[in-house]
């Protein structure tokens, strides 16, 4: 390992013989190859048959809610929590049960983990010196890194004299100083305020692209994942829900969970009135193109549509009357909360509109307007709560 903090502990290291995975393993040339990884803590299974390949130079985000298994997977890659079964290969070398100090990675934690009694210079140099580098060469390399992270004048300061963002830059430089093959980031920005977080994530991306280092970042922040990652791994309850580019995750969620978790999504209860007509509330519209689903006549389901793919219009046949409940100003646009007319107990529908349109239409709470679906990027998912009206039992294909 290229960086080791003295307070890191290895947990649940199997005693005696290591469990063997006798399943045939496909040959992979990916930089990091994870196959059928399971991690159990007593009777609780934190990771369930996780398989994932990461290419050299990729920036990958593990995204999901608390308890989904993303940090456990990161710790398995680092050797801090060894898998119960499965295999992990880095650069075609088996590392599944190697101790952290024998692995090729640098790691940055949410808590910075800097030594408070050492200066910035000493914090970055400690790993270099531990590997036998001369004082002169170590200080020369530290100077280069301080220049790179914008802290050239802070070499003699102590961590307590730095802001949170500056401390995290030092932690990043320390992790990268030994030129590891893999950089692991465990929610490194979550303790910072919003403005610093935005600035630092840009710096991390620039540094990652400049170095070309394979990077994995754990986060629960959708915006971080969407703006930073080449690919996102969405996790839930110890399984991978979807792997894809930020655009794929946002525009083509593979499951209802992904659709709910990433961004804002409206789930509009609908039913098939006929083979060509959709019923929404008390209105009927022509059946739009649904990307992931072929509906059956009489079936009930939820139509998933982003707020930016809805619009409020003057009345026409393909629009649904709604009552505006609230307008939320979000700087670049308004988010308009609506309910279907005559169905005040139904879930609200959110529409994102340009400021100029809201002003031109003189929209205000209590107004009745008409909701229209923009063509494209419509998806469908099964209802969470079963309707009292039996749905059609014909074979209908959902994504999830």
Feature names for model-found ranges:
Residues 3-8, 12-13, 265, 275-400:
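Non-catalytic connector elements of ABC transporters
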């Amino acid at each position: 390992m290229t960086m080791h903090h003295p307070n890191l502990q290895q947990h649940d290291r199997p005693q005696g013989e290591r469990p063997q995975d006798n399943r045939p393993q496909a040959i992979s040339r990916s930089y990091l190859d994870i196959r059928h990884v399971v991690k159990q803590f007593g009777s609780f299974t934190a990771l369930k048959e996780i398989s994932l390949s990461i290419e050299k130079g990729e920036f990958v985000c593990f995204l999901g809610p608390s308890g989904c298994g993303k940090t456990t997977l990161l710790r398995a890659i680092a050797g801090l929590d060894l898998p119960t079964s499965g295999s992990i290969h880095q650069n075609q070398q088996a590392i599944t049960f190697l101790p952290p100090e024998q692995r090729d990675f640098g790691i940055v934690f949410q808590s910075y983990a800097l030594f408070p009694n050492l200066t910035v210079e000493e914090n970055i140099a400690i790993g270099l010196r531990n590997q036998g580098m001369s004082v002169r060469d170590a200080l020369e390399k530290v100077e280069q890194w301080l220049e790179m992270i914008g802290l050239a004048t802070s070499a003699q300061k102590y961590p307590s004299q730095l802001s949170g963002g500056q401390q995290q830059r030092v932690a990043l430089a320390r992790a990268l100083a030994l030129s590891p093959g893999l950089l692991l980031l465990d929610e490194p920005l979550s303790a910072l305020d919003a403005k610093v977080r935005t600035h630092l994530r840009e710096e991390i991306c620039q540094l990652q692209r400049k170095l070309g280092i394979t990077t994995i970042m754990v986060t629960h922040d959708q915006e971080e994942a969407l703006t930073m990652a080449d690919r996102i791994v969405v996790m839930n309850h110890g399984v991978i829900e979807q792997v894809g580019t930020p655009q794929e995750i946002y525009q083509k969620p593979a499951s209802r969970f992904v659709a709910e978790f990433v961004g804002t999504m409206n789930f509009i209860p609908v039913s098939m009135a006929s083979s060509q007509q959709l019923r929404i509330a008390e209105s009927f519209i022509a059946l739009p193109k649904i990307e992931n689903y072929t509906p059956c006549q009489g079936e009930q389901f939820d139509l998933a549509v982003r707020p930016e793919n809805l619009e409020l219009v003057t009345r026409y046949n393909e629009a649904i009357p709604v009552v505006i409940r609230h307008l939320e100003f979000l700087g670049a646009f308004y988010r308009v909360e609506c309910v279907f007319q005559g169905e005040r107990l139904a879930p609200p529908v959110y529409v994102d509109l340009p400021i100029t349109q809201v002003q031109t239409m003189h929209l205000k709470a209590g107004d009745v307007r008409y909701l229209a679906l923009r063509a494209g990027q419509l998806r469908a998912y099964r209802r969470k709560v079963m309707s009292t009206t039996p749905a059609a039992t014909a074979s209908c294909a959902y994504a999830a």
